[in-house]
Amino acid sequence: MSATAEDTTLEITRVFDAPPARVFDAWLNREEWQAWIGPEGMDCDIPLLEPRVGGRYRITMRLSDGRVVPVAGVFKTIDSPRRLVFTWGWEGDPSRESLITITLREKGDKTELTLRQEGLGSVSNRDDHGKGWNSALNKLVAYLTTHRP
């Protein structure tokens, strides 16, 4: 039995101790995004960030074995501080492009973030991305805790 689109869609919800605008900005500011994007223990660089609809980004992830894995995409929707939609593609493998939707909701003095990644192709790929995003979101929690405005 093959996996359905819903089976291969990743959805993660987290609550952050920061207002929606602060959480949203951490996705579109190069220095901030670079500080937390990627799984724990992985260094990332963002050589390209055009934070506008139709703008592109590129992230280079340095693995512990020294390999560099580039990810690139295009911003489809930027609706501050509520919604951010962008493509996510592993360079060199156009068949692995997916769509990420970040939705932010105010919850008192906190923010509920939902990350939905569609088009992952397989349950295994969904699970691998889930591990990576959960780790990156752990880093975002820590970053927002130590970098308050």
Report each predicted region and the residues it spans:
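Hydrophobic ligand-binding cavity/cleft-lining segments
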Residues: M1-D43
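Beta-strand/loop substructures that line and gate deep hydrophobic ligand-binding cavities in soluble
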Residues: R83-N134
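Contiguous, well-ordered beta-strand patches that form the walls/edges
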Residues: G66-I78, R82-E91
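Intrinsic-disorder/low-complexity, polar/charged segments enriched in Ser/Thr/Lys/Arg/Asp/Glu/Gln
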Residues: D7-T13, P20, R56, P70, ...
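Short beta-edge strand/loop motif at the mouth of beta-sheet-based domains
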Residues: E11-I12, E31-V68
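Hydrophobic pocket/interface hotspot
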Residues: V23-F24, W33, Y57-I59, F75, ...
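Hydrophobic/aromatic beta-strand elements that line small-molecule binding cavities or substrate pockets
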Residues: R14, P47, V71-K76, S98-R105
